[in-house]
UniProtKB/Swiss-Prot annotation:
Name of the featured protein: Ribonuclease HII
CDD domains: RNase_HII_bacteria_HII_like (cd07182)
Keyword list, A-Z: Cytoplasm, Endonuclease, Hydrolase, Manganese, Metal-binding, Nuclease
HAMAP family: RNase_HII_B
Cofactor details (free text): Manganese or magnesium. Binds 1 divalent metal ion per monomer in the absence of substrate. May bind a second metal ion after substrate binding.
Catalysed reactions, semicolon-separated: Endonucleolytic cleavage to 5'-phosphomonoester
Organism this protein belongs to: Chlorobium phaeovibrioides (strain DSM 265 / 1930) (Prosthecochloris vibrioformis (strain DSM 265))
Purpose: Endonuclease that specifically degrades the RNA of RNA-DNA hybrids.
A single GO molecular function term of this UniProt record: manganese ion binding
């Protein structure tokens, strides 16, 4: 993956920010968003950053190796976490928008353009943006944000695994796998579960 999309924008602006989230679909844990701004005319080269892809297509070990390289290469980056209790209170869409806006706010600079993975965004500041469905598969800065968000969330879920080992959070990261559903049947929900998320397999309305 190259920075072709960003290069078109760099002709007329400087600070292009990629934004993505991890954790909209799980039954437990936070939603995490990341924002990444690379220097103007950045090129990934042939090293670890030359292997960039949608984080879902990268192995966990490669994501962990890539994340610090992204942070070192970026002009600015930020990660924001919105917990399960907030998700239950304001709903997952609003929580995702909150996480994304907090990530942008944590950059320490004002981007000229936001490139947001997906089809919806509600900016809290007056900045130009584009929503791009599947953007993490072809836009470098969005893919980089997806790696930072996914890596951060995986680390959080691994820490929760130590607190609640009976659920296996390190293995499924809170997603509704058969293992996770079975654990909820046996143990009920724990404090990091999203109580507003209902599961048909648990006969919840």
């Amino acid at each position: 993956m190259l920075t072709d999309y960003e290069e078109q924008l760099w002709n007329s602006m400087e600070r292009i920010c990629g934004i993505d989230e991890a954790g909209r679909g799980p039954l437990a844990g936070p939603v995490v968003a990341a924002a990444v701004v690379f220097p103007r005319w950045f090129r990934p080269g042939k090293g670890i950053l030359g292997r960039m892809n949608d984080s879902k297509k990268l192995s966990p070990s490669l994501r962990r190796e890539m994340a610090p390289a992204i942070q070192d290469a970026a002009l600015a980056w930020s990660v924001s976490v919105v917990d399960a209790q907030t998700i239950d209170r304001i709903n997952i869409l609003s929580a995702t928008m909150l996480a994304m806006n907090r990530a942008v706010g944590g950059l320490g600079l004002t981007p000229d353009m936001l490139l947001v993975d997906g089809n919806r965004f509600s900016p809290e500041t007056p900045v130009a943006y584009r929503t791009l469905v599947g953007g993490d598969a072809y836009i470098y800065s969005i893919a980089a944000a997806s790696v930072l968000a996914k890596t951060a969330r995986d680390a959080i879920m691994s820490s929760y695994d130590r607190d609640y080992p009976e659920y296996g959070f390190a293995r499924h990261a809170g997603y509704p796998t058969a293992m996770h559903i079975s654990a909820i049947r046996q143990h009920g929900r724990c404090p990091i579960h999203r109580f507003s998320f209902k599961v048909r397999r648990l006969n919840e309305a």
